[in-house]
Amino acid sequence: WRILNESGTLYLHLDYRESHYAKVLLDALFGRDCFLNEIIWAYDYGAKSKSRWPSKHDTILVYVKNPDSYYFDSSAVDREPYMAPGLVTPEKAERGKLPTDVWWHTIVSTTGREKTGYPTQKPLGILRRIIQASSKEGDLVLDFFAGSGTTGAAAAELGRRFILIDQNPESIAVISGRLEKQGVAFELQRARPQNR
């Protein structure tokens, strides 16, 4: 919380097993008035269950540091098609609509070009949307659990600076390879344990 810019936004991605705990924690940390959205990232891929409703979504909790001065630019985000285009004018159907708090976006294909091989890789489209809406060109984006480096890849593509943090050596190798392949200049720093 202390390092978040006054106009900054926190996006926390979780699955159904943890989101309710995190919501209570973040309400206590930020204050309930700083809760902006609960985004549902829905996808149609993964496990099938006959004993319960199959889980086909993740949750992204969105908090702002200051509800009076946070940055949000919905016009920077790609529009999406109407689900029932016949119910709106042809002009509106062609223009599309702004995304709501339910994002239909496939997971990263196991055979697609975007795949890095990292097990919990997030799609570039999801991070692009988050970064476009909540930051300006030149802003700093921070990911404490960088995984496959999707946040850095999207930030670089959109002209944002970024800091990626992860302690997993596999993650660091994937991120380094991904950013090098993308032609992104970066500096790798290893944390040194500190005695307290």
Predicted features and spans:
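Core catalytic lobe of class I
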Residues: 1-174, 181-182
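PRPP-dependent phosphoribosyltransferase catalytic core
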Residues: 170-196
